[in-house]
Amino acid sequence: MYKPDKETALLCYRMLARTRALNTVLELKRHRIEGPVLTGLGAEAISIGIGMALLRRGILKESLLNGNQRTQFGFGVIKDIAFSDDHDHGYEILKNHALVATATSQGEDGNIHWGCLDHGILPFANSDMGRMIPVLVGMAEEMRRVRWPQIEDARKRPVAIGDFGEGALNQGCIAEAMNWVAASIVV
Protein backbone atom coordinates (compact mmCIF):
# COMPACT_ATOMS: atom_id res chain seq x y z
CA MET A 1 0.00 0.00 0.00
CA TYR A 2 1.27 3.45 -0.92
CA LYS A 3 2.06 5.65 2.05
CA PRO A 4 2.74 9.26 1.05
CA ASP A 5 5.51 11.27 2.65
CA LYS A 6 4.58 14.27 4.79
CA GLU A 7 4.95 16.79 1.94
CA THR A 8 2.67 14.77 -0.37
CA ALA A 9 0.09 14.25 2.39
CA LEU A 10 0.01 18.00 3.07
CA LEU A 11 -0.38 18.74 -0.64
CA CYS A 12 -3.30 16.31 -0.81
CA TYR A 13 -4.91 17.92 2.24
CA ARG A 14 -4.42 21.38 0.71
CA MET A 15 -6.18 20.31 -2.49
CA LEU A 16 -9.02 18.63 -0.59
CA ALA A 17 -9.53 21.68 1.64
CA ARG A 18 -9.60 24.07 -1.32
CA THR A 19 -12.02 21.87 -3.25
CA ARG A 20 -14.31 21.52 -0.24
CA ALA A 21 -14.20 25.29 0.31
CA LEU A 22 -15.79 26.00 -3.08
CA ASN A 23 -18.65 23.64 -2.32
CA THR A 24 -19.17 25.29 1.06
CA VAL A 25 -19.29 28.75 -0.55
CA LEU A 26 -21.80 27.50 -3.12
CA GLU A 27 -24.00 26.01 -0.40
CA LEU A 28 -23.89 29.23 1.65
CA LYS A 29 -24.62 31.46 -1.37
CA ARG A 30 -27.16 29.09 -2.94
CA HIS A 31 -30.04 31.58 -2.74
CA ARG A 32 -28.05 34.17 -4.77
CA ILE A 33 -27.09 31.83 -7.60
CA GLU A 34 -29.38 31.44 -10.58
CA GLY A 35 -30.28 27.92 -11.64
CA PRO A 36 -29.26 24.70 -9.94
CA VAL A 37 -26.21 24.74 -7.73
CA LEU A 38 -24.16 21.70 -8.59
CA THR A 39 -22.04 20.81 -5.59
CA GLY A 40 -19.69 17.93 -5.03
CA LEU A 41 -21.37 16.48 -1.93
CA GLY A 42 -18.03 14.93 -1.01
CA ALA A 43 -17.50 13.28 -4.39
CA GLU A 44 -15.02 16.01 -5.31
CA ALA A 45 -12.37 13.98 -3.48
CA ILE A 46 -12.32 11.63 -6.50
CA SER A 47 -10.57 14.27 -8.57
CA ILE A 48 -7.91 14.75 -5.91
CA GLY A 49 -7.02 11.05 -5.90
CA ILE A 50 -6.77 11.06 -9.69
CA GLY A 51 -4.66 14.20 -9.65
CA MET A 52 -2.30 12.88 -6.98
CA ALA A 53 -1.72 9.70 -8.99
CA LEU A 54 -0.96 11.69 -12.15
CA LEU A 55 1.25 14.12 -10.23
CA ARG A 56 3.17 11.25 -8.64
CA ARG A 57 3.69 9.71 -12.09
CA GLY A 58 4.88 13.08 -13.43
CA ILE A 59 2.25 13.32 -16.19
CA LEU A 60 -0.34 15.67 -14.69
CA LYS A 61 0.61 18.75 -16.72
CA GLU A 62 0.31 16.98 -20.08
CA SER A 63 -2.77 14.88 -19.28
CA LEU A 64 -6.35 15.78 -20.25
CA LEU A 65 -9.05 16.03 -17.57
CA ASN A 66 -12.78 16.23 -18.17
CA GLY A 67 -14.82 16.60 -15.01
CA ASN A 68 -18.48 16.62 -14.23
CA GLN A 69 -20.23 18.92 -11.77
CA ARG A 70 -18.61 17.07 -8.87
CA THR A 71 -15.03 16.92 -10.08
CA GLN A 72 -14.52 19.91 -12.40
CA PHE A 73 -13.41 22.23 -9.61
CA GLY A 74 -11.10 19.59 -8.15
CA PHE A 75 -9.42 19.19 -11.52
CA GLY A 76 -8.98 22.97 -11.62
CA VAL A 77 -7.42 22.97 -8.16
CA ILE A 78 -5.05 20.16 -9.12
CA LYS A 79 -3.89 21.94 -12.26
CA ASP A 80 -3.51 25.23 -10.31
CA ILE A 81 -1.18 23.56 -7.86
CA ALA A 82 0.69 21.65 -10.57
CA PHE A 83 1.28 24.71 -12.74
CA SER A 84 1.67 27.21 -9.88
CA ASP A 85 1.42 30.15 -12.25
CA ASP A 86 -0.94 33.10 -12.21
CA HIS A 87 -3.78 31.21 -13.90
CA ASP A 88 -6.31 30.39 -11.18
CA HIS A 89 -8.76 27.82 -12.59
CA GLY A 90 -10.55 27.43 -9.27
CA TYR A 91 -11.24 31.15 -9.02
CA GLU A 92 -12.55 31.19 -12.60
CA ILE A 93 -15.01 28.40 -11.77
CA LEU A 94 -16.13 30.23 -8.62
CA LYS A 95 -16.70 33.43 -10.66
CA ASN A 96 -18.85 31.45 -13.10
CA HIS A 97 -21.03 30.09 -10.31
CA ALA A 98 -21.41 33.58 -8.83
CA LEU A 99 -22.39 35.00 -12.26
CA VAL A 100 -19.59 37.57 -12.22
CA ALA A 101 -19.48 39.61 -15.44
CA THR A 102 -15.72 39.03 -15.85
CA ALA A 103 -16.12 35.24 -15.69
CA THR A 104 -15.68 33.16 -18.83
CA SER A 105 -19.47 32.87 -19.11
CA GLN A 106 -19.71 36.69 -18.77
CA GLY A 107 -22.16 36.35 -15.90
CA GLU A 108 -24.73 34.50 -17.98
CA ASP A 109 -24.63 30.90 -16.77
CA GLY A 110 -23.19 29.63 -13.53
CA ASN A 111 -23.38 25.96 -14.45
CA ILE A 112 -20.84 25.90 -17.24
CA HIS A 113 -17.12 26.39 -17.29
CA TRP A 114 -15.08 26.79 -20.43
CA GLY A 115 -12.19 24.81 -19.02
CA CYS A 116 -8.67 25.64 -20.08
CA LEU A 117 -7.43 23.71 -23.09
CA ASP A 118 -3.95 25.21 -22.66
CA HIS A 119 -3.74 23.35 -19.35
CA GLY A 120 -5.64 20.23 -20.40
CA ILE A 121 -8.98 20.96 -18.70
CA LEU A 122 -11.94 20.30 -20.98
CA PRO A 123 -15.07 22.44 -20.71
CA PHE A 124 -18.03 21.50 -18.58
CA ALA A 125 -20.28 22.89 -21.26
CA ASN A 126 -23.74 21.54 -20.60
CA SER A 127 -25.74 19.68 -18.01
CA ASP A 128 -25.78 16.60 -20.22
CA MET A 129 -22.58 15.39 -18.57
CA GLY A 130 -21.75 12.65 -21.02
CA ARG A 131 -21.65 14.84 -24.11
CA MET A 132 -18.01 15.80 -23.58
CA ILE A 133 -16.76 12.20 -23.22
CA PRO A 134 -16.62 11.54 -27.01
CA VAL A 135 -14.71 14.82 -27.40
CA LEU A 136 -12.26 13.65 -24.74
CA VAL A 137 -11.89 10.28 -26.49
CA GLY A 138 -11.12 12.05 -29.77
CA MET A 139 -8.50 14.22 -28.11
CA ALA A 140 -7.02 11.16 -26.41
CA GLU A 141 -6.83 9.38 -29.75
CA GLU A 142 -4.92 12.31 -31.23
CA MET A 143 -2.60 12.31 -28.21
CA ARG A 144 -1.96 8.57 -28.64
CA ARG A 145 -1.19 8.91 -32.34
CA VAL A 146 0.87 12.10 -32.28
CA ARG A 147 2.47 12.54 -28.86
CA TRP A 148 2.93 9.02 -27.54
CA PRO A 149 5.41 7.88 -30.23
CA GLN A 150 7.73 10.66 -29.06
CA ILE A 151 7.76 9.33 -25.47
CA GLU A 152 9.68 6.08 -25.17
CA ASP A 153 8.81 5.26 -21.54
CA ALA A 154 5.14 4.17 -21.58
CA ARG A 155 4.81 5.16 -17.90
CA LYS A 156 5.55 8.78 -18.82
CA ARG A 157 2.87 9.09 -21.49
CA PRO A 158 0.03 11.49 -20.66
CA VAL A 159 -3.48 10.12 -20.30
CA ALA A 160 -7.04 11.38 -20.72
CA ILE A 161 -9.45 11.00 -17.82
CA GLY A 162 -13.15 11.78 -17.92
CA ASP A 163 -15.88 10.97 -15.49
CA PHE A 164 -19.63 10.74 -15.62
CA GLY A 165 -22.42 9.27 -13.54
CA GLU A 166 -24.68 6.31 -14.14
CA GLY A 167 -27.33 8.61 -15.62
CA ALA A 168 -24.99 9.72 -18.38
CA LEU A 169 -24.14 6.09 -19.08
CA ASN A 170 -27.61 5.75 -20.62
CA GLN A 171 -26.65 8.13 -23.42
CA GLY A 172 -25.65 6.61 -26.71
CA CYS A 173 -22.64 8.90 -27.04
CA ILE A 174 -21.08 7.34 -23.93
CA ALA A 175 -21.57 3.80 -25.24
CA GLU A 176 -20.07 4.77 -28.60
CA ALA A 177 -17.09 6.47 -26.94
CA MET A 178 -16.43 3.38 -24.79
CA ASN A 179 -16.76 1.14 -27.86
CA TRP A 180 -14.23 3.31 -29.71
CA VAL A 181 -11.76 3.08 -26.83
CA ALA A 182 -12.22 -0.68 -26.51
CA ALA A 183 -11.75 -1.21 -30.25
CA SER A 184 -8.61 0.97 -30.22
CA ILE A 185 -6.77 -1.09 -27.61
CA VAL A 186 -3.94 -3.10 -29.11
CA VAL A 187 -3.61 -6.47 -27.39
Segments (PLM) and residue ranges:
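Cofactor-/ligand-binding subdomain signature composed of acidic, glycine-rich
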Residues: 1-35
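Cofactor-binding active-site loop characterized by glycine-rich and histidine/acidic residues
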Residues: 24-187
